[in-house]
């Protein structure tokens, strides 16, 4: 009985800790942490040369040949989780997507794409690895960027 109480208290503590985390919707997030500095130096040119995704709540998710427009970002009281309706485009393909976004740390968010998860589960995409769930991408917040510089 003592073990059960201890396990439940640990679960409650981690849930409370996650509720304290906030997603800063005014900043740019990148799929590769080193991309923040590259974006600061090169602006939009970094997207041409880089192999990473950017996420902003104003512009959606983008890379050189991929873009997801966010149409609706929903939140609920007492939870840091976000629900996003999106329309995504890649060369020759347009599709709707639903994203779940959760804070994973002070400057990291987890984005789960229902479309990507379905594509992995049906064998269209390769699984991301043994420790990563299908459809999950981690993004790191760029502390100095609220928009991508255009020179």
Describe the residue ranges of each PLM region.
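Sec-dependent signal peptide recognition
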Residues: 1-8
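N-terminal signal peptide c-region/cleavage motif recognized by signal peptidases
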Residues: 12-14
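Contiguous, well-ordered beta-strand patches that form the walls/edges
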Residues: 59-106
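Helix-rich interaction surfaces within compact, conserved domain-sized segments
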Residues: 97-124
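Edge beta-strand at a domain terminus
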Residues: 115-151
